Amino acid sequence: ALETGTLKKLVLARQLQVELSDSIDSVALFYHACTLYPHAFVSLVSTPQSGTWLMATPETLLAKRPVGDQWYTMALAGTMDHSGPWAEKNCLEQRLVVDYIETCLQPHVVQLQRSMPYVRQAAQLYHRCTDFLFVLKPQVNLGNVIADLHPTPAVCGMPKALAQDFILREEHLHRAYYSGFTGPLNVWKTTHF
């Protein structure tokens, strides 16, 4: 599909199963992740239905600050393991995500502001990042905004519908919560996914 040009981008997952001889202290692991990744969104969720999931991501899908009407998202794409000049492939990949996010937001927002791309470090990796600030139009349903944005090209591909179909047909593993989103919804007037 990539060779024929049907898909501009495709992100496939792979699964690794490891058997551990000792039990894991998930809370200690959570605190360790918070220390290792101070600028990431780190969360630990454990329920009988879903199991235990430790998540750490430098990416913000959608966030609202506690004061005012301003929302935020980012286009985080293009990855290198060192700082330096960016390859054209990484610049193009990030530009695709910027265009995708702008297109998704247009029907839902006013006062859309976009930063210039900059380098954002996440642990030992460097990413190209563009920030978006905006105000939601009155009567906009937050669920519709999320449905338009997610999954982003960074975890699925482009065009979204074709990439999703390809993944469901060819990947042969259940992603469960992998590449999903989590976070507080209107907790102390803050939302952060």
Explain the meaning of each model-derived region:
Residues 15-16, 47-53, 102, 117-125, ...:
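A glycine-rich phosphate-binding loop feature that marks nucleotide/adenosyl-phosphate handling sites
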Residues 11-15, 106, 187:
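Short hydrophobic alpha-helical segments that form membrane-spanning helices or hydrophobic packing faces
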Residues 18-19, 72-168:
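Contiguous alpha-helical scaffold segments within structured protein domains
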